[in-house]
Curated annotation (Swiss-Prot):
<feature type="signal peptide">
    <location>
        <begin position="1"/>
        <end position="25"/>
    </location>
</feature>
<keyword id="KW-1015">Disulfide bond</keyword>
<feature type="modified residue" description="Proline amide">
    <location>
        <position position="114"/>
    </location>
</feature>
<dbReference type="InterPro" id="IPR021116">
    <property type="entry name" value="Calcitonin/adrenomedullin"/>
</dbReference>
<dbReference type="GO" id="GO:0005179">
    <property type="term" value="F:hormone activity"/>
</dbReference>
<protein>
    <recommendedName>
        <fullName>Calcitonin-1</fullName>
    </recommendedName>
</protein>
<comment type="similarity">
    <text>Belongs to the calcitonin family.</text>
</comment>
<dbReference type="Pfam" id="PF00214">
    <property type="entry name" value="Calc_CGRP_IAPP"/>
</dbReference>
<keyword id="KW-0964">Secreted</keyword>
<feature type="propeptide">
    <location>
        <begin position="26"/>
        <end position="80"/>
    </location>
</feature>
<dbReference type="GO" id="GO:0005615">
    <property type="term" value="C:extracellular space"/>
</dbReference>
<keyword id="KW-0732">Signal</keyword>
<feature type="region of interest" description="Disordered">
    <location>
        <begin position="101"/>
        <end position="136"/>
    </location>
</feature>
<dbReference type="InterPro" id="IPR001693">
    <property type="entry name" value="Calcitonin_peptide-like"/>
</dbReference>
<dbReference type="InterPro" id="IPR021117">
    <property type="entry name" value="Calcitonin-like"/>
</dbReference>
<keyword id="KW-0027">Amidation</keyword>
<keyword id="KW-0165">Cleavage on pair of basic residues</keyword>
Amino acid sequence: MVMMKLSALLIAYFLVICQMYSSHAAPARTGLESMTDQVTLTDYEARRLLNAIVKEFVQMTSEELEQQANEGNSLDRPMSKRCSNLSTCVLGKLSQELHKLQTYPRTNTGSGTPGKKRSLPESNRYASYGDSYDGI
């Protein structure tokens, strides 16, 4: 991808250089034609055009590299962009979900967590059990 952009930049540079050399040559038109019909670039305009092309190319390349770096390293990137319903993709998605579960902070909820379990006093907690055993 970058090679195509680089080749396009080199072609544009070559065309600008050719235009600069042809502007110094004798005009191919006759003197009867008006000067407004000629479309030639001065050296200043050619330099400005070349500068604009180079700046645009560098900006596009840097944005593309940032986008690739962000997408390539992200675990949250959607799996649908990479593949769909393949066993390796399903395993990859499951491993990502497992990784997310392992890295998220734990919350103190559930049956095995420490903390206040009941608000009943100890003497009243097992009172009903004693009555049921005495009846047997």
